[in-house]
Amino acid sequence: MKNRQFIVFALLLACPLLLHGQETSLCGKESCNKGYIRHPWYGKKVGYIGDSITDPNCYGDNIKKCWDFLKEWLDITPYVYGVSGRQWNDVPRQAEQLKKEHGEEVDAIVVLMGTNDFNSSVPVGTWFAEKEEQVMAARGETKKLETRKRRVPIMTNDTYKGRINIGLSHLKKLFPDKQIVLLTPLHRSLAEFGEKNVQPDESYQNKCGEYVDAYVQALMACT
């Protein structure tokens, strides 16, 4: 099951290549044949931020990770910072480490996080808080201060959406001109890692009454 999930994940990330159909092929280091185009990520340097799904130390060489497949298919150089068990509140730390060690040489960043937020029953929360403020405005008359409601992003590690707000803000500040790809949590099957770590499949709610769908939809709203 896990192997199939990894393969599906990698295929989805590489879908721009697949969508070109039969007239499109991955070009190697040799010149492309007429009618073929090179995948835009071919030969690029990509940072991976995540949890056990990307952690190079998790399961060793027994299970290939998504970045292994992309390295093979697209000759990508992977900079992997995923750590097993981490949640969205670890994104800033991993991003800082990526920036420190590779700076501007990274071409794109992939974030695959969220399944542990669900499993740990982190409340989904809301994106914004509203408050009344005065703002200068004019609509065909002399400008003046008006009182209007304003929405402000909630920056808190107490909720899932608050963590995403913090993580994305951090990534944009560190890598303002880089492509950032957010991937949703994968489907969850029953996972038993011992007497004190048994995770039911996705047909069950977590302890705060949410299905994994809510965590998937939250990330989809960021796109």
Give, region by region, the residue ranges found by the protein language model.
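Bacterial N-terminal signal peptides that target proteins for export
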Residues: 1-7
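Hydrophobic h-region of N-terminal signal peptides that target proteins for export
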Residues: 11-20
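Serine-esterase "nucleophile elbow" of acetyl-processing enzymes
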Residues: 21-82, 95-104
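Amphipathic coiled-coil/heptad-repeat helices and related helical stalk/stem segments
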Residues: 31-32, 63, 91, 164, ...
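Active-site-proximal beta-strand/loop segments in catalytic clefts of secreted hydrolases
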Residues: 49-52, 81-86, 112-115, 183-187
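Generic structural signal for helix capping and beta-alpha/helix-loop junctions
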Residues: 56, 88, 189-190
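Alpha-helical cap/lid subdomain in secreted, periplasmic
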Residues: 73, 94-223
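Structural motif
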Residues: 86-96
